[in-house]
Amino acid sequence: GKLLNSNNYLVYCGGGEGVMEAIAKGVSHDGGTCVGILKGISTDEMNQYIDIPIATNMGITRNALLAYSCDASVAISGNYGTLSEIAYALQLNKTVIGIETWDIDGVQNMDSEAKVIQKLNRMFK
């Protein structure tokens, strides 16, 4: 999150706990902006570091909104929710970069956050 923020990226995530909260916390560290695409109808489920909450009431199908909203996707570890985010992004021909995540065709796995930022910067700057 800190690296994304220090490189001036607007960050979208699911807005919940775990990796989503860690990313949002890092983004907010120096005043960055993190958008949370939430599963429920209220903001009660979001973590405290989300700047712009979007309550969808869509459950896990909100992962499609995440994929549509982003220019690229970074998947960090994760379970089936992360897998569905990866699948949506790949179906939309978005770049998917992974760190210790699903090993499937189309995911560009990196072994460090610094390499992820280098890849994003080559793509967008």
Model regions and ranges:
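Acidic/glycine-enriched connector segments
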Residues: 17-88, 100
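Short, flexible loop segments at boundaries between secondary-structure elements
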Residues: 103
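Short acidic-hydrophobic, aromatic-tinged amphipathic segments that line or gate anion-handling sites
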Residues: 53-57, 97, 107-122
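A short, Lys/Arg-enriched amphipathic alpha-helix followed by its capping loop at the start of a domain
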Residues: 3-9
